[in-house]
Each structure stands twice: as C-alpha cells, then as structure tokens.
C-alpha cells in the first residue's frame, strides 16, 4: 500500500495503515501539492476545527523530497500553543506531550546531521513524526519508497478510486468514522477525521482499538 506523506495525518490515514495487511510505503515521487495534508493538519478546538499549516519553500511542481520547511511566522511555537490550548484538558495530553513537543523545536544543523532524518525537509520531518506516532499507537510504520521503484500497489491519498492505481479520500465518500470521546464534543458535536493527535490525546492507548474497529477504507 502506497500512501502520500502527511503532517500529523488524519485518523482515516492511520485507519488504513492499521488495517493494512500488506507492506506500506510513503510515495517519494509525487510533486508537492499546496493546501493538502502534506503540510497541514486539523485539530478540534473549543470553537470548532482549526487547521494548522507548516510554511514551506519550493516550487509547487517540485518533487516532495525537495520541499524545505520555512521558519516563517514562528509556526512551531504557535502550533504547540494551539495544541496545548485545545488538548491541555484532554485525558492523555500530558502523557504524550514529551513525545510530541520535540517536533515543535527547530533542530540545529548538528542535530540534523546526527539524526536519521533531516527536519529541514518536509518529507523527512513528516516521516519521523509518522514513525513516532506508529510506535506510540502500536502499528508498523511505513517505509519511504525508493525513487526507482515501479508503482505496483494502490496509492492511498486521503476513498474513492479517482485514477488507475490511486484511491483518494475526498472527505465525503469515505466510510463513516465512528465517534470517540472528544473534549469539546458537548459543544461542537463529534468532529470526524481530525489529526491523529486528536485521537491520541483523547483515547490514549485505546487509539489502536478505535482504528481497527473503524469501517475499512478499502473493502
């Protein structure tokens, strides 16, 4: 199964990964697309959904591997503040904070050099986030697809098949996501398909059970 890269991916993305019986890969050959889950994620707040974006540098037609993260607008501090405000009272925010907060600190060149992934690049930043989240949830993390590999598996891009070998989640045709506890559910109702952080901060170790109990994305 071939997935597009995603920043703190939505629950539906992890639902497919948790239920997948085959090897999962992250596509490294696609061109970057603006205003997608590649560099943005949505959280549930007291006033409703809030989308957080990571600013990037590079042409809109550039390969995803070449997209650099920008330091514009001090986004790291703003994102962490938004998460702390939205989920500070959730059951498992403090439990996972030490695992998640480091992703909102800029690495030094030496730290990047000593790490498996260089956080100056969006794809590598996303990959370390995904591996960390998979380890927390208890599922096998996908691998980066080598550039020279032929596409022999379906591409899951976020649930209707829109092109040969591609399955796209458009937010309308995907199978219904079963509600789970959310902090502001009494005010907003259940907000489906938020970032996986929403599920983790609210459900903790039971997140894997929620993911496996959801209707399969691909029958």
Where are these regions (language model features)?
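Residues lining hydrophobic/aromatic ligand-binding pockets adjacent to catalytic sites
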Residues: 1-219
